[in-house]
Curated annotation (Swiss-Prot):
The chain crosses the membrane at residues 15-35. GO terms for molecular function: heparan sulfate 6-sulfotransferase activity. InterPro entries: Heparan_SO4-6-sulfoTrfase, P-loop_NTPase, Sulfotransferase. This is Heparan-sulfate 6-O-sulfotransferase 1. Its EC number is 2.8.2.-. It holds the Pfam family Sulfotransfer_2. 3'-phosphoadenylyl sulfate binds at residues 90-98, 182, 190, 314-316, 320-321. Its main location: membrane. The gene is HS6ST1.
Length: 408
């Protein structure tokens, strides 16, 4: 009887070794085959009452760019009680306001952000001390300037927090940059409508290499206080319009091209350097989401930082840009004006989809392995002789324990 039990344990051990080897093989295989493999669904996640909350991975997705597995995993050991800080780079008209509110109002935290009525900023302290873990518009305000870009934030954030939260002999902070991107045509039209209603970002600093640009380096598209009432044609005709390729400019290291000095290097070379810099910085960010994929954005953020949202994200397709009727010629013109953004978005969308595919499929594979182990354990328990099962499950009673003590 005992021999039969040992045989069953040996079989179980061999099976688990085979399963472990299979997992390693599948991870190696993914590197070459890509995310087309269908590997299964997540387990133990929130929103169990909504099994279809996150879209099923597309088994027919064809990737455009090659990314090694290390670029797809993106699971960080974010330590809110340590020195880690999330820095949100908010690009205009990408849905950043909604996402920023999610960060301060919708994350399940040990110590929730303190958001009081009538106040524009929330207090987001760490659970163990009065220091912020989030650098964003709705937590620290525009501390590095209105809609500060990558160049500004990376040079400004450490100093700002160092002055606000100085402490002797402290461990250096670790910054995790995040952002949202949007389809360039939709984003451009949304910005035009925003400007048409009288909005401006003229208080933005555009700080680069320790100074702001001169009026000659960054001319204005309009005279007066704002550009309200401008037509789409007027908006497109301004050669200095910062709406053109805004996403690339705000994600690139502008120091590489002489900041806003257009005569620093030839225009074609400048454009290529900016695009490659934006791609690199985006890829190296801790996380980025896409406005067009709210649920996938939520999913990737949660898995990257191991933080859960209280309420699921909603996908709103009826935006102001969506209500603008433009002909095909105008769309092509907008695409030309935003050619760098179009290339960046194509790159970002593919990386985003590959990360989503990878994480979802990995979770499904882990769930399959877990289910197999549970079935194997159940079968092994059923296979044990009845007497042995009863003997293993018998609990010592008080009389039985007294008998043992007396005998001893």
């Amino acid at each position: 009887m005992k021999r039969a039990g040992r045989t069953m344990v040996e079989r179980t051990s061999k099976f688990l070794l085979i399963v472990a080897a299979s997992v390693c093989f599948m991870l190696i295989l993914y590197q070459y085959v890509g995310p087309g493999l269908s590997l299964g669904a997540p387990s133990g996640r929130p929103y169990a009452e909504e099994p279809d909350l996150f879209p099923t991975p597309d088994p027919h997705y064809v990737k455009k760019y090659y990314f090694p597995v290390r670029e797809l995993e993106r699971e960080l050991a974010f330590d809110m009680k340590g020195e880690d800080v999330i820095v949100f780079l908010h690009i205009q008209k990408t849905g950043g306001t909604t996402f920023g509110r999610h960060l301060v109002q919708n994350v399940r935290l040990e110590v929730p952000c303190d958001c009081r009525p009538g106040q524009k900023k929330c207090t987001c302290y760490r659970p163990n001390r009065r220091e912020t873990w989030l650098f964003s518009r709705f937590s620290t305000g525009w501390s590095c300037g209105l809609h500060a870009d990558w160049t500004e934030l990376t040079n400004c954030v450490p100093g700002v927090l160092g002055r606000r939260e100085s402490a002797p002999n402290r461990t250096p902070r670790k910054f995790y940059y995040i952002t949202l991107l949007r389809d360039p045509v939709s984003r451009y039209l949304s910005e035009w409508r925003h400007v048409q209603r009288g909005a401006t970002w003229k208080t933005s600093l555009h700080m680069c290499d320790g100074r702001t640009p001169t009026p000659e380096e960054l001319p204005s598209c309009y005279e007066g206080t704002d550009w309200s009432g401008c037509t789409l044609q007027e908006f497109m005709d301004c050669p200095y319009n910062l709406a053109n390729n805004r996403q690339v400019r705000m994600l690139a290291d502008l120091s590489l091209v002489g900041c806003y000095n257009m005569s620093f290097i030839p225009e074609n070379k400048r454009a290529q350097i900016l695009l490659e810099s934006a791609k690199k910085n985006l890829k190296d960010m801790a996380f980025f989401g896409l406005t067009e994929f709210q649920r996938k954005t939520q999913y990737l953020f949660e898995r990257t930082f191991n933080l859960k949202f209280i309420r699921p994200f909603m996908q709103y397709n009826s935006t102001r840009a969506g209500g603008v009727e433009v002909d095909n010629d105008t769309i092509r013109r907008i695409e030309e004006l935003n050619d760098l953004d179009m290339q960046l978005y194509d790159y970002a969308k593919d990386l985003f989809q590959q990360r989503y595919q990878y994480k979802r499929q990995l979770e499904r594979m882990e769930q399959r392995i877990k289910n197999r182990e549970e079935r194997l354990l159940h079968r092994s328990n059923e296979a044990l002789p009845k007497e042995e099962t009863e003997e293993q499950g018998r609990l010592p009673t008080e009389d039985y324990m007294s008998h043992i003590i007396e005998k001893w």
